[in-house]
């Protein structure tokens, strides 16, 4: 059985490129979520964030592990911004599908806060998942097709998120 995760953390190209490579991630697609416009598109996505939908095998990878990479590859302390990308489209958000994901998201954020790995306070939103509008084909797997394309996401070397008991 598979599970679904929906995240937003800046431009969806870089998020998808790194998350899709995790063992246990079966499928990813980029799109628009967390906002107010039905049938969102790149040119008209209102208050939606650029997001990624992840289908994963929980026997091979945990939701927590996906969130650990999420917090490693984007800056969760900058509101409505990732690198040079500025605006609500680029906010940090976790859209949970059930109470278990909500709990894990809140615990992981608390671990990030306690770890000191990021210099500021985490501003990642935690909200229930709503509609996910798939982005246009040219945005899907963008960096797989254009390996030298734009991204502001990268794994930080030696970045390991401890649980609070180990971080304190």
Curated annotation (Swiss-Prot):
NCBIfam families on file: msrA
Name of the protein described by the UniProt record: Peptide methionine sulfoxide reductase MsrA 3
E.C. no: 1.8.4.11
Lineage: Bacteria, Pseudomonadati, Pseudomonadota, Alphaproteobacteria, Hyphomicrobiales
Keyword Transcription belongs to the record: no
Catalytic activity: L-methionyl-[protein] + [thioredoxin]-disulfide + H2O = L-methionyl-(S)-S-oxide-[protein] + [thioredoxin]-dithiol; [thioredoxin]-disulfide + L-methionine + H2O = L-methionine (S)-S-oxide + [thioredoxin]-dithiol
Organism: Rhizobium meliloti (strain 1021)
Family per record: Belongs to the MsrA Met sulfoxide reductase family.
Record-annotated active site: 11
Signal peptide per UniProt: none
Domain of life: Bacteria
Functional description taken from the UniProt entry: Has an important function as a repair enzyme for proteins that have been inactivated by oxidation. Catalyzes the reversible oxidation-reduction of methionine sulfoxide in proteins to methionine.
Record-linked InterPro entries: Met_Sox_Rdtase_MsrA_dom, Met_Sox_Rdtase_MsrA_sf
Keywords: Oxidoreductase, Plasmid
